[in-house]
């Protein structure tokens, strides 16, 4: 197969599917292996005839051969590993990653809209303060914790270790928690709302959901509407482990997936175990009235459009802050 057609994540072979700037890692199935082989390779076998001659008979890839291809792909040196798949600029310990796959296993899927960014930290405070001007942060520390969350996905491949989960919380509903986690964080970093997931009721189901998220290549995720008391072994492992171990869907084997996820949760009046609290950075919102849903004094009523318009400037500011640091 052509070089760069197949990759693997934790020895699970797959393809990068989608348009530039929105690629996703999709595990290779037997059916897909057959289609790829037939598209790029002409298979044949020699069949003996009665007159002691042989004739070359061409054939399509069968299921057994597709299984061999899939098995070989997870360890073949031509099939390179992707540890981190990002559609926004990121930094490793060696510096800023250029488009494509770098030697550390970071793949930068550069979208056309982010070409030729010019990092500039000069107006960082003004740019970032204006981005969240409509959100009622309880304190300046909470606001700056959110700015730290914006920076986390950019420097995540650089950090040799774990990063805490950020938790956006409030005592009331409709204060803007989900908008902050999905529309602002996702809109700036990945150009679309942060992927949201509900925590399943059992740790086994949580582990399956987390493993699927990591294999797909998501770099940020939103745990929406967390219940009042947070206590999950699967979630604690996700926050603290450099690799996440789980059972590969549909198979009996266990796999270890590199865990470079930046995680944000939202909830009302959330409490957690002491062990979980050590792994969480709070971002508290405190509305000025008891009816935040009735608020109308927004500087930017169409938040998604505002984020779309300023995304490039905000990313240039964040990259400039990283460079200055």
Predicted regions located by residue number:
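Walker A (P-loop) phosphate-binding loop of P-loop NTPases
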Residues: 173-175
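N-terminal nucleic-acid engagement/recognition segments and initiation subdomains in replication
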Residues: 1-141, 148, 158, 208, ...
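Walker A/P-loop
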Residues: 178
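Feature primarily recognizes SF3-like P-loop helicase cores of small DNA viruses
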Residues: 143-149, 158-166, 183, 187-237, ...
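Residues at the beta-strand->loop junction immediately N-terminal to the Walker
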Residues: 169-171
